[in-house]
From Swiss-Prot:
<keyword id="KW-0328">Glycosyltransferase</keyword>
<dbReference type="InterPro" id="IPR001173">
    <property type="entry name" value="Glyco_trans_2-like"/>
</dbReference>
<dbReference type="InterPro" id="IPR050834">
    <property type="entry name" value="Glycosyltransf_2"/>
</dbReference>
<dbReference type="GO" id="GO:0016757">
    <property type="term" value="F:glycosyltransferase activity"/>
</dbReference>
<dbReference type="Pfam" id="PF00535">
    <property type="entry name" value="Glycos_transf_2"/>
</dbReference>
<comment type="similarity">
    <text>Belongs to the glycosyltransferase 2 family.</text>
</comment>
<dbReference type="InterPro" id="IPR029044">
    <property type="entry name" value="Nucleotide-diphossugar_trans"/>
</dbReference>
<keyword id="KW-0808">Transferase</keyword>
<protein>
    <recommendedName>
        <fullName>Uncharacterized glycosyltransferase HI_1695</fullName>
        <ecNumber>2.4.-.-</ecNumber>
    </recommendedName>
</protein>
Amino acid sequence: MKFSVLMSLYIKENPQFLRECFESLVAQTRQADEIVLVFDGVVTPDLEFVVTEFETKLPLKLVKLPQNRGLGKALNEGLLHCDYDWVFRMDTDDICVPDRFEKQVAFIEQHPESIIFGGQIAEFGKNVNDIVAYRNVPTSAQEIIKFTQKRCPFNHMTVAYQKSAVINCGGYEDLQEDYYLWIKLVAQGLYMANLPDILVYARVGNGMVSRRRGVNQAKAEWRLFKLKYRLGIQGLLSGLFTFALRFGSRLLPTSLLKKLYQTFLRK
């Protein structure tokens, strides 16, 4: 089978992080058939240099947006340029384990009814030997449905999905773009899973926690609650309770939100 990798690059990315990401793609035991890299607006000359360096090493397909449109819209645009129905997501500052694609291709071949699946991540600081936490997500469809009521059930940078299914349900939203999408897919009763294996080393710091707080993120929680209730993912009282907890967390100072993540949401 053939598959596309979908990535989005923006001006504030660190060139060294991008280089390490690309190196992990070069080192894959099963190479991607194409890598669609969306430039979400103008990027720095240093980032352009790294991309040019790897154009001879990776099957890069560049999609350049004239203005920054945000991750959700950039990914929606990138999907339209993916030649293959199976799309593997990757972030430009993370690092794939060497056999990530090999494992995911094997899963698809063993489970052709699959629509979406991902895996586990190890979060790191300075380098992949500096593991600070793990974000574990459930592996079975039944556990994923239950998990979706309260938290995002997939690690976005590990996910592989069928492009047609994502486009048919409306694609990505602007805020909390992945969680909205997973809710819509889960509600359709499609075959889904997560591998128990760590597939990606995810970089922490780099503004990760601060991007998850703020008034707009808090407002997005109300839309999440309404979507989960409307699609039958979560009941009214349980949904309101979850909304209150998630809404409040979005308004915490960054230092407190970081402690919340470390204490309750990571292992």
